[in-house]
Amino acid sequence: MTTRLLQCRDDIFVKMELDNPGGSHKYRAAKNIIESSIISGKIIPQKTTIIEKTGGNFGLGLLAVCSRVGVDVDLAVGLSFSKYKRKILRSFGAQLIGIDLLQQGMTPREVVEYHISKQEVHGKHYFYTDQFNNKLGVEAHRIQTGSEIARQLKENHSGNDVIFIGCAGTGASFTGTCNALKDHGYNVIPILIEPDGCDSKNEIFVDHRIEGVSVGVRPPFLEWNLISETMTVSSSEFMKARQKFFSETGLLLGNSSAASMAAAYRIREEKRLQSIPIVTIAYDSGLWYDDY
């Protein structure tokens, strides 16, 4: 499906990926991985169980796809992620695995590896979607998300220059979208958003409130040579941006989406790059979160 490109004030455009099934941009990668793996025979409906470590959005995307094709989903969800998202994942059919192991200090990846090693004992036939190493995620955003933005932007704005503001967990959506815009003839100024205190390139991470971003590993699919600038955003800044966006549109953004909007607002307030449209992504809705 094609999601909206919402035009806001000051030539800021927001790709409303929260309109996807599953409620986020992660549906794109999940759909591409599952459908491609069914075609290749790596996933057999009614037999295979998907296993993945995810903080919520990719899991919801997997459920949105797998529920239609008869594939079960087992997820290792870090204990720091939204309790509400975990509740939703369970209610829509996911099995949340390894909670006791996580409480004992295992990482979600270690939980996945442990369950894969024990799959025969538990009568499982696992397929690990492995979003941090699966290039089908990047492909989904290059073919779909970025190409949609390019077509929609041409309908709303003349010129070939565009600022793209985004966050990175795996880096799949950032890299895929930027490269798609370049494929369509745009001169892209990519700006990466990080939480205050984080520097993913140099593997510096601190505790923060932007789930799914700067997650403790260098984003594997982020093409660093693409990035023109990195901006950091504080919790107070993204919360103010979320309130401002809600006042203007009536729409409630999730934390990473609000952080991207905070950067867009800051660029406009600084009166730089004024003649160039800004595109950012509403990755998911603020309704998923309970940390206001």
Model region roles, listed by residue range:
Residues 1-292:
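PLP-dependent amino-acid enzyme catalytic core
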